[in-house]
């Protein structure tokens, strides 16, 4: 495996050739500047001999059909392995769900991004590949962040693409973080990366980014980089700014960020999440409605169990509507413009 990676510099290809696990860990050096450690399939760490004090996690492929972030991360890994760029920050890349990537599907058995913060081991337990992998990914995050002294900035960008078109092509979800202000610097980093829209979540979740934020105090985000396309069919010119800023972050080049300015970004607050309680749940709007479509107060969004679910605020925008989820799961997130958010 070591020789295959050294020859090809293609970590994604090696991962997909061995989607369940590698036969043990291995490591090697890039010149005298970087130690590379491969912990598992889809798990690779770049340890600079001299680092600048940030611990960066870039994860992708938690959903197997969300290919643009996978190609983006593999491109960065390849540049690092080819020594075209040199890491100056500790960096962990995670390719989340290799089995689903090979399958060309979002999931194998279950939505992995609902299985973190220990949810993987709640009943029925570790009964499918996503649950097993989520537990391992948590362990790799823990190993990475706790291998060095506290006090360093921890960052985790969990990269996705959405199943539908969007009024805002690229957007990020800022996990709930009670008692901690939102980072204006991080929001402006996202804006410089082409991600000009941020949703402030209002409650704990079992997503990957919330896990890193809550457990390790990381500046963590779920980042949606556009729409789902098959592997190899993404227009990677749409990610030039994202690639550039991630490269600057990893190599510790000046980020040259603007000061936080709420007028330069679109900020939303999650006002509620609507979960499914009955099999007859259905939305009243078209199935192909775009993310961030806005509806006025009193509009009937959905019906289930003989009840109507209506817009409660003057206007609410919807993201991720999906009526076909299992009972108990989220069908949609409702948003209002963020006012008085504690951004510093």
Swiss-Prot record:
Residues holding Zn(2+): 63, 66, 160
Catalytic residues identified in the record: 224
Cofactors named for this entry: Zn(2+)
Reactions catalysed according to its record: N-succinyl-L-glutamate + H2O = L-glutamate + succinate
Enzymatic class: hydrolase
Pfam families: AstE_AspA_cat (PF24827), AstE_AspA_hybrid (PF04952)
Annotated S-S bridges: none
Pathway: Amino-acid degradation; L-arginine degradation via AST pathway; L-glutamate and succinate from L-arginine: step 5/5
Entry EC number(s): 3.5.1.96
One Gene Ontology biological process: arginine catabolic process to succinate
SUPFAM superfamilies reported for this sequence: Zn-dependent exopeptidases
Source organism superkingdom: Bacteria
Gene3D superfamilies, per database record: Zn peptidases (3.40.630.10)
Cofactor note as given: Binds 1 zinc ion per subunit.
One MF term in the entry's GO annotations: hydrolase activity, acting on ester bonds
Family annotation (HAMAP family): Arg_catab_AstE
Function: Transforms N(2)-succinylglutamate into succinate and glutamate.
Entry's family note: Belongs to the AspA/AstE family. Succinylglutamate desuccinylase subfamily.
Protein name as it appears in the record: Succinylglutamate desuccinylase
Gene name linked to the record: astE
């Amino acid at each position: 495996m070591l020789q295959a990676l050294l020859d090809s510099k293609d970590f994604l290809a090696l991962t997909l050739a061995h989607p369940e696990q590698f036969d043990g860990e291995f490591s090697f050096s890039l010149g005298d500047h970087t130690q590379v450690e491969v912990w598992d399939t889809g798990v690779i760490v770049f340890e600079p001999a001299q680092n600048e004090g940030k611990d960066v996690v870039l994860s992708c492929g938690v959903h197997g059909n969300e290919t643009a972030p996978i190609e983006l991360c593999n491109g960065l890994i390849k540049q690092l392995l080819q020594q075209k760029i040199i890491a100056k920050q500790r960096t962990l890349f995670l390719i989340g769900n290799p089995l689903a990537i090979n399958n060309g599907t979002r999931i194998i058995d279950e939505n992995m991004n609902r299985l973190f913060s220990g949810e993987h081991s709640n009943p029925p337990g570790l009964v499918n590949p996503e649950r097993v992998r989520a537990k391992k990914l948590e362990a790799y995050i823990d190993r990475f962040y706790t291998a060095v002294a506290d006090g360093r900035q921890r960052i985790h960008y969990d990269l996705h693409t959405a199943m539908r078109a969007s009024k805002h092509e690229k957007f990020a979800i800022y996990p709930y973080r009670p008692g901690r202000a939102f980072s204006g610097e991080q929001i402006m980093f996202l804006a410089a990366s082409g991600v000009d829209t941020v949703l402030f979540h209002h409650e704990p979740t079992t997503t990957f980014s919330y896990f890193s934020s809550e457990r390790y105090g990381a500046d963590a985000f779920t980042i949606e980089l556009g729409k789902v396309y098959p592997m190899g069919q993404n227009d990677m010119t749409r990610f030039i700014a994202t690639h550039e800023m991630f490269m600057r972050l990893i190599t510790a080049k000046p980020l040259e960020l603007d000061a936080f300015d709420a007028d330069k970004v679109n900020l939303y607050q999650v006002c509620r999440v609507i979960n499914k309680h009955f099999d007859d749940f259905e939305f009243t709007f078209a199935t192909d409605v775009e993310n961030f479509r806005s509806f006025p107060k009193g509009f009937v969004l959905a019906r289930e169990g003989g009840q109507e679910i209506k817009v409660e605020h003057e206007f609410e925008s919807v993201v991720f509507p999906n009526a076909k989820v299992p009972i108990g799961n989220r069908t949609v997130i409702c948003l209002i413009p963020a006012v008085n958010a504690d951004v510093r």
